[in-house]
Amino acid sequence: MKNLFNLFLMFFFAMPILSLSENPTNFSESCEDGSGETGSSFGIGFDLVLDFGLYRNSCPEAESIVYSWVETTVLEDPRMAASLLRLHFHDCFVNGCDASVLLDDTEGLVGEKTAPPNLNSLRGFEVIDSIKSDIESVCPETVSCADILAMAARDSVVVSGGPRWEVEVGRKDSRTASKQAATNGLPSPNSTVSTLISTFQNLGLSQTDMVALSGGHTLGKARCTSFTARLQPLQTGQPANHGDNLEFLESLQQLCSTVGPSVGITQLDLVTPSTFDNQYYVNLLSGEGLLPSDQALAVQDPGTRAIVETYATDQSVFFEDFKNAMVKMGGIPGGSNSEIRKNCRMIN
């Protein structure tokens, strides 16, 4: 298991950030601390009640097993932090946080892995498999794959220098998955701010949650095909959009024209690509957001612009809002047709 041209390497929402690999997705209100008290309940779909301390007695080794695998994997491949974070995003945004994104296709089930936003883009499945195997060996049929995704996402942020939060657990794993739901439900890297706000609100997430979760794009990479629209002023000879950094766009165009749009890849954050920090927002204010949907946060809406400015100047505010938004997103419930899988790739 176990300088401007140096942007050229891969990419998630997703992200995504987010790795927030090839087609990142753009992603609270205060949450309780880790007291062991009953946690979130979402009024969306099947009612889900989560608990901060569910596994303290039934599987006390669970969190340490997850952290050990994430730490080792990210040390070997820093991009994996974004990949694991993005897996959790893409899971929760499609019919809730139910590990449906992990199901392999079968003769009777065409799931989310082959949906356009995920195909040849999501990664990290083997890491989740390894974590699940180790946990099953000590606590069989106790810890859900959906909870593993939530803990692995948190630990990916932590080992990358970001904040830690208590993860509520008690999710169940879906026995179904939907390619169409993934195709229709995941935001595009070309989404406008109004579309993003609507998408997040439909899941019970606020505008602040959306801007905070988009900060996951401080990690990961993206293919040229994900940000072609950012290069349009250079390609068409039209005036640059408000907030565009022409030097930045020219460097991207050089990359994509040299190696080809389907091959060219670059960091979502060129300054601190493997560190979870607030540099993503600083980049947006200087016109160096990679994805159209990222740069839009700083130029299309005064409300999101104000949040971007706050996060760019105060990392502690970003960290606090990100933690709260992750807990809130992690409480989006799945359906009632669920179980605790023995193998995350297939139903029992």
UniProtKB/Swiss-Prot annotation:
Disulfide pattern: C59-C139, C92-C97, C145-C344, C224-C256
Residues engaged in binding Ca(2+) 1: D91, V94, G96, D98, S100
Positions of heme b binding: H217
Cofactor note: Binds 1 heme b (iron(II)-protoporphyrin IX) group per subunit.
Top-level lineage group: Eukaryota
CDD domains the record matches: secretory_peroxidase (cd00693)
Residue numbers binding Ca(2+) 2: T218, D269, T272, D277
Top EC category: oxidoreductase
Region (Disordered): 170-189
Catalytic activity entry: 2 a phenolic donor + H2O2 = 2 a phenolic radical donor + 2 H2O
Remaining remarks: There are 73 peroxidase genes in A.thaliana.
Name used for this protein in its record: Peroxidase 40
